[in-house]
């Protein structure tokens, strides 16, 4: 029984897809356990970029099983589109399995997402308008439609009719918005269900059988710990649990079967959308990092906010997700800077604190306390070991490991598979 969980430790966009793809080489099953198509991940294979939003990164290994678990909310329209994209690129999807217990995102979820965000005015939370939150709301309210329901024509029609009638009343009475048509949605989405039917099964059986047989299973999280609905910067969060604990709920695998948790982070910090960001940069250094790091959202295309590495955030992520290993990405983006900074603590009203406050009002008053290290000018994109890094870059990497309190297993100096360097094999140490 061997399992590894990959989680983002910041606000998403840390390079989880790349690290999952890298670790997938030694896994036999790869599974997503939460989120939806609001999370984009980019994988580079032989110089070619593949951008996925819903299907696990492991799909590029045809001999391995890729799983969309029950904790994921699935937009069938997006899924069918993504399948077609992969097929057009010559990628087989015969190895995909989708949980029959996963909940379905429907057009009324997306419309409600947009209307709710618009109604917030200046208090918007920066949702991707993918219907994720409303779909999870229906799930919690026990009125959601699952993949198993989508495949049954009569059940789907009955539940869609009830849900749409309620949502249309809401659209018309509360938001003065146009109601949606039952027949159009039913016809379109039932057809999508038939297209994905071949992939649908009880994925908890597949995952537990694989683990019981001694196979290596890799769990892939979406977003990041700081976007977790319980542990993140609430309410500027997603509607699910990206933390490692979300695996057990979102996959049907018990906590006793989880061996390692790999936390993925960048050598700096980025965030899409609104919400607290203590180390955010507004100067030319921030702009340089954004441009060199191509910091634009995979899903939204929006410029990401960028800032210095925040070890307070990282220690919070380590604690609430039980991180055992760290994967440090995008070190190369910092090349050329005269100095680099790491936030080691916050100043809150004159008091030094080393924890991440839950209160948004306190976070607004938090000022980062920095440790400054000398930068490096060398191009490190061809580096293949820690010893090959310039001394200043090597010291920066080591200092991050010390401040976070987790050993660094891999570090990356570019987007390619070959630019990921192993310091310690996660699989071998289990």
From Swiss-Prot:
Family: Belongs to the adenylosuccinate synthetase family.
Record GO cellular component, one term: cytoplasm
Localisation per UniProt entry: Cytoplasm
Protein name, UniProt field: Adenylosuccinate synthetase
Disulfide bonds: none
Annotated signal sequence range: none
CDD domains reported for this sequence: AdSS
Domain of life: Bacteria
Active site: 13 (proton acceptor), 41 (proton donor)
Pathway: Purine metabolism; AMP biosynthesis via de novo pathway; AMP from IMP: step 1/2
SUPFAM superfamilies in UniProt: P-loop containing nucleoside triphosphate hydrolases
Residues that bind substrate: 298-304
Primary enzyme class: ligase
InterPro entries for the chain: Adenylosuccin_syn_GTP-bd (IPR018220), Adenylosuccin_syn_Lys_AS (IPR033128), Adenylosuccinate_synth_dom1 (IPR042109), Adenylosuccinate_synth_dom2 (IPR042110), Adenylosuccinate_synth_dom3 (IPR042111), Adenylosuccinate_synthetase (IPR001114), P-loop_NTPase (IPR027417)
Stored NCBIfam families: PRK01117.1 (NF002223), purA (TIGR00184)
UniProt KW tRNA processing keyword: no
Coiled coil: none
Entry EC no(s): 6.3.4.4
